[in-house]
Design a protein with these regions (language model features):
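Conserved donor sugar-nucleotide recognition element shared by glycan-biosynthetic enzymes
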Residues: 79, 110-111, 135, 160
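Short glycine-rich anion-binding loops that position phosphate/pyrophosphate groups of nucleotides
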Residues: 49, 111, 182-185
Length: 187
């Protein structure tokens, strides 16, 4: 049998030209460079945990890792106890009642949720309202999926809340989705 040594260049999808490098990816590189130069940097970047979990949490994780029933896929909607716990937390902290069976979907992260919501509700060419400043993923995923991003400003003097009067005066006829963060972003 003859061995073939051939390399194929696989070009990225054209849609990637519509986005730039993730904002926090660039910032983390800048922070790493500054640290390498011996500068004392206080990172105000992504909310990556900087403290280990409690001993009780680590012990519980270790104990559960030994459970032979704990290694399979979980239900797509998450386990009921988790969804109920989320609903109780929202009620306690925000006074918001959520139905754990129909209004809560555990995810592996916000990017997964933003992707799924955009795929489910927005067609290419439709518009999406994105807060400025806001989470960069709203813009990057919207662009990758072929939607038109319309920014709306969040201002400190307005408590970082949307100016609904300004929004009402805009042509929103093609807007399919409005991204918001609550309590708010930036936090």
């Amino acid at each position: 049998m003859q061995k073939v040594n051939q390399t194929y260049k696989i070009a990225p999808a054209d849609r990637l030209a519509s986005v730039s490098e993730y904002y926090f990816s660039k910032k983390l590189k800048e922070v790493a460079q500054m640290n390498a130069e011996g500068k004392d940097v206080i990172s105000l970047g992504i909310g990556s945990p900087d403290m280990p979990p409690s001993e009780k949490t680590i012990e519980t994780l270790c104990n559960n890792a030994h459970d032979p029933n704990g290694h399979g896929y979980q239900p797509y909607v998450g386990i009921p106890e988790l969804r109920k716990g989320f609903a109780a937390w929202y009620q306690r902290w925000y006074g918001v009642d959520l139905n754990p069976n129909t209004e809560i979907q555990p995810l592996i992260g916000s990017k997964e949720g933003i992707l799924h919501v955009t795929l489910a509700f927005v067609n290419p060419g439709e518009q999406v309202l994105v807060p400025n400043p806001g989470y960069p993923t709203y813009t990057s995923l919207s662009k990758i999926l072929g939607t038109e991003v319309i920014n709306y400003d969040l201002k400190e003097e307005d408590g970082w809340m949307p100016d609904f009067e300004t929004l009402e005066n805009m042509d929103l006829g093609r807007v399919k989705l409005m991204w918001t963060n609550y309590p708010n972003m930036p936090t």
